[in-house]
C-alpha cells in the first residue's frame, strides 16, 4: 500500500472535496453483521438515530463549518457497495467461516443508499438525526461520527504551515511507536483496531493500522474497519452492539418481553450465525441485571465484552459469574474495549494473565491521540466523547442504561422507568473522556 504524506495532504487545501468517507465499507464490521440480522428479522422497524455530544463543553457547531459538514454528509449519500466490495464480502472468510453473508442479503445490500439526514444548530451544537427503516438507517452511525471528528481535526489544523504540520505528525508517529514498543513486552497479547468512529482522520487510522501490523505482528489480530481489512488483508473483527437490545426493549409490549429483550437478541444472533461470533455485550441495561437474570445457556457462549465499567472491575464481575455457573474462566474470553490507553491495556493484561483469555479493542487512544504533539495547545486536537445512538424505534423511546450513568441515553422519564425495572446495582459514575 502506498504511503501518504499526511502532513502534505492536510496542508494542500486545493481540492474541491476531499471525501472523509470513501466507501460504505469504511465502517465497523459489526454494523454489517447486525445489518444482516436487522434485514432478516426487523425489516419493517423504523428508527431514529441521534448525534449526542457528551463533551458538552465543546461547541461543535462553532468549530465545524455547516456547509462543509453538509457536503461530507451529502457525499456519503452518493456511495454504494462496489462490485469489488461485494465480491470480497461474498468470498472472504470471517472468523474462519465462509459465506457469512447470505446471497439474498448481499443482493439487497448492493442497491443500498443511505436515507436523508436532518441537520440544525442549537446552543453551539449540531442536532443531527437520521430517520427511516432500521436496515437503511443504521449504516449512518459510523460515517456520521467519523465525519464530525475529522472535520474537527481539519478545522484545528487549517491555519498551520506545512512544516508545523509535519512536526505534529512526526511527533504523533513517535508517540504511537512508543506505545507499540510497550505492547511488544506483553507475550501472547491480542489486540485489534476499534478506532474508526472517533479517529483523527481516515489516513491517520490507516497509518496506525499499518504501524501495528508491522510493529507487533501476530499480536495485532485485525481491525473493525471493513475497508481497511479488505485493503490491508487483515481480519475484520467485531460482533454486536447495544442497538440490538435497545430496539428489542423499545418494541417490548409487556414486562416479560422487556425482561427477555437482551436474551432474545442473543438467541436470534446464535441462530443466524450458527454458533459463531458468540460474544455477549452485557451492559445495555446494566451488567449486574444482565447476569442476575441470564439463562444458563449464556454461560456457554465464548465470552463477554465488558464495555462501560472499569476493565478490571468489569472483568472480575464476569469471571465471578462464570465460576458461579460452573464454567472455567480460563476457557473463556474477555474483550476489553472501553476508552483504553496503553497503561490500561498493560494493567488489565497483567491483572488477568493466566486467569482468562483476553483480547483488546483499541479505539480513540489509538487513532486520535495528538495530545502534546502540537507546538502549542490546540483544543480541536483533543478527542471528544461523541456517539450516535438509536433514540426511537417505531415511535417508542429507546434507552441505554450502561454501567456508567454518564453514558446513559434516552428520555429522562424512560431512563428512570428502565432503572426501576432492571435496577441500578453496581452502576458507578466515572469520567467519560472518549
Curated annotation (Swiss-Prot):
Pfam families: NAPRTase (PF04095), NAPRTase_N (PF17767). The keyword Phosphoprotein applies. Its EC number is 6.3.4.21. Pathway: Cofactor biosynthesis; NAD(+) biosynthesis; nicotinate D-ribonucleotide from nicotinate: step 1/1. GO terms for molecular function: nicotinate phosphoribosyltransferase activity. GO terms for biological process: NAD biosynthetic process via the salvage pathway. Gene3D superfamilies: nicotinate phosphoribosyltransferase. GO terms for cellular component: cytosol. It is an enzyme of class 6 (ligase). It catalyses: nicotinate + 5-phospho-alpha-D-ribose 1-diphosphate + ATP + H2O = nicotinate beta-D-ribonucleotide + ADP + phosphate + diphosphate. InterPro entries: N/Namide_PRibTrfase (IPR041525), NAPRTase_N (IPR040727), Nic_PRibTrfase (IPR006406), Nic_PRibTrfase-Fam (IPR007229), Nicotinate_pribotase-like_C (IPR036068). Keywords: Ligase, Phosphoprotein, Pyridine nucleotide biosynthesis. The modification Phosphohistidine is found at residue 242. Transiently phosphorylated on a His residue during the reaction cycle. Phosphorylation strongly increases the affinity for substrates and increases the rate of nicotinate D-ribonucleotide production. Dephosphorylation regenerates the low-affinity form of the enzyme, leading to product release. Catalyzes the synthesis of beta-nicotinate D-ribonucleotide from nicotinate and 5-phospho-D-ribose 1-phosphate at the expense of ATP. Belongs to the NAPRTase family. This is Nicotinate phosphoribosyltransferase.
